[in-house]
C-alpha cells in the first residue's frame, strides 16, 4: 500500500530493464515531493509495471485494478489551495488515494527521468471522488523527463495531471475505463508524439464506458484562477470509439492543440470538441485560451457550448 513506499525524506529509486509486479489491488508506488524516480528501460526491454496475474497468464483483455498505479508528486505550482496561499510554499493539496501532500513554488522541479516503460492493469477506486489512475502527476515540474511510455487498461484515467509543468513525449494510452488523458488545477506542461485510443469498454456492472479521450479542467470552484491550465498538445492522434467526447474542455481550461488528428465515431460518440460551459467558451479568445492549428477534426459535429452544435 502507499504507506509501504511513501517517505518524507527525499529518496531516489531506480528501475533498469526491470519487471515490477504487485500482487494486491491496493498496492501502488508513490514518489513523494523532493524524491526522484528513474526508469531506464530500452526499446527492446522496457520496464513493465503490472499485476501478478499478468505473469501467470490469468489476465483478461478487459483486466483492470490489478494494482493501484504510479503516483508522482512534486514541488511545482498548482491552483488548488487557498487563494491567499497561491504561489507560495503553503499552496499544497492532498493527493488521491492518501498519497500525501504535493505542491510548492518550483516549476522546474525534477522528480526523475523515466523512459521506455509500461504501466498496465492499474488503478483503484476508493470512492467516486478518490481514485487512482494509471499514472498521476501531482504538481510535477518541468525538470522531470518522461518519454516512451504506455499506459494500458487503467481502471480510472490513463494519465492525469494535477497542476505542474511536466511534459511527456512518445506515449500511448489505451483501454482506460474513465478518461484517457485528464488534467486539472493549472497544468501547463505538454504532451507530444502520442496515440490515444478511447475504446468501448465493459464496466463492472455490465454497462459500457462513455468517457472522454481528453477531459480537461482548470478549477471548478474558480474557473479563472491562476495558474490556469494551458498545456500544449502536439502530434497526437486521438480516437474516440464510443460514448464520450474526444475533447471535453471545461472549467476554464485553455489548450494549444497543434498538428494532431481528432477523430470519433459519429454514431456513438457524444462530440468531437465539447466546450462544456460558458466560462470556458468565453476564455477561448483570451490569452491562454483555446488555440487549434494544423489539426484535422475527423467527425461530423462539434459542441461549442452546452446545447449548441456546429455541423461541418
Task: Label the predicted regions.
Residues 16-34, 41-42, 46-156, 160-308:
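Extracellular beta-rich repeat passengers
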Residues 2-9, 302-309:
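Conserved small/polar residues in nucleotide/adenosyl-binding loops
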Residues 7, 11, 39-42:
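Beta-strand repeat architectures
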Amino acid at each position: 500500500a502507499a504507506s509501504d513506499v511513501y517517505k518524507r525524506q527525499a529518496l531516489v529509486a531506480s528501475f533498469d530493464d526491470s519487471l515490477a509486479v504487485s500482487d494486491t489491488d491496493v498496492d501502488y508506488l508513490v514518489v513523494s515531493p523532493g524524491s526522484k524516480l528513474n526508469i531506464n528501460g530500452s526499446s527492446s526491454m522496457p520496464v513493465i509495471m503490472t499485476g501478478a496475474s499478468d505473469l501467470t497468464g490469468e489476465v483478461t483483455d478487459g483486466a483492470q485494478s490489478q494494482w493501484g498505479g504510479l503516483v508522482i508528486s512534486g514541488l511545482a505550482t498548482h491552483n488548488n489551495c487557498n487563494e491567499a496561499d497561491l504561489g507560495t510554499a503553503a499552496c499544497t493539496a492532498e493527493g488521491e488515494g492518501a498519497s500525501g501532500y504535493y505542491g510548492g513554488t518550483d516549476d522546474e522541479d525534477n522528480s526523475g527521468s523515466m523512459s521506455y516503460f509500461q504501466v498496465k492493469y492499474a488503478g483503484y477506486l476508493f470512492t467516486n471522488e478518490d481514485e487512482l489512475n494509471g499514472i498521476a502527476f501531482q504538481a510535477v515540474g518541468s525538470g522531470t523527463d518522461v518519454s516512451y511510455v504506455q499506459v494500458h487498461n487503467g481502471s480510472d484515467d490513463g494519465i492525469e495531471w494535477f497542476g505542474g509543468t511536466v511534459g511527456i513525449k512518445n506515449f500511448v494510452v489505451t483501454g482506460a475505463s474513465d478518461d484517457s488523458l485528464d488534467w486539472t488545477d493549472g497544468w501547463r506542461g505538454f504532451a507530444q508524439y502520442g496515440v490515444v485510443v478511447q475504446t468501448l469498454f465493459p464496466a463492472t456492472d455490465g454497462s459500457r464506458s462513455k468517457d472522454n479521450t481528453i477531459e480537461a479542467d482548470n478549477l471548478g470552484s474558480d474557473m479563472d484562477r491562476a495558474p490556469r491550465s494551458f498545456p500544449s498538445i502536439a502530434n497526437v492522434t486521438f480516437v474516440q470509439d464510443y460514448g464520450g467526447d474526444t475533447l471535453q474542455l471545461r472549467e476554464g481550461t485553455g489548450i494549444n492543440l497543434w498538428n494532431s488528428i481528432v477523430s470519433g465515431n459519429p454514431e456513438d460518440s457524444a462530440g468531437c470538441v465539447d466546450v462544456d460551459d460558458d466560462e470556458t467558451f468565453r476564455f477561448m479568445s483570451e490569452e491562454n485560451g483555446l488555440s487549434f492549428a494544423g489539426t484535422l477534426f475527423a467527425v461530423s459535429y462539434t459542441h461549442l457550448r452546452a446545447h449548441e452544435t456546429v455541423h461541418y
